[in-house]
Amino acid sequence: MINLTKAPFFLVKEDIEWVENTKKAMTLEEKIGQLFVPIGYSGDADYLEHVMLSHHIGGIMYRCGEAKEMQRTHRYLQEHSKIPLLVGANLEDGGCGIATDGTQYGKQMQIAATGDTEDAYRLGKV
């Protein structure tokens, strides 16, 4: 049995009860759906409802789009998902990995080419 009070979870009693009760109430189809994290290509409500939510996905991997559209899509999915979704995006070179109008910074090789350890530190901190 996994100890949910320890790293990396650090859940309190109420959170653990929510996890256990939620898991018990899930159908086999819902449990299988949690294994999938599809790429979100559209913010269209019909698409999100049919393709994403009807399959009980465990999360979504976003590709670049306008920040407001990404936020609207994410909010819609979280509000309509029975279980909170995990979120993924390619953020190796900054916020532009999810939002085209996000802040861009150099990739790891570009930072290494500067020879400046402070730049590397700042990249790691972000």
Ranges and model annotations:
Residues 1-56:
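Preference for extracellular/luminal or secreted protein segments
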Residues 41-126:
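Enzymes and membrane/adaptor proteins characterized by extended Gly/Ser/Thr/Asp/Glu-rich
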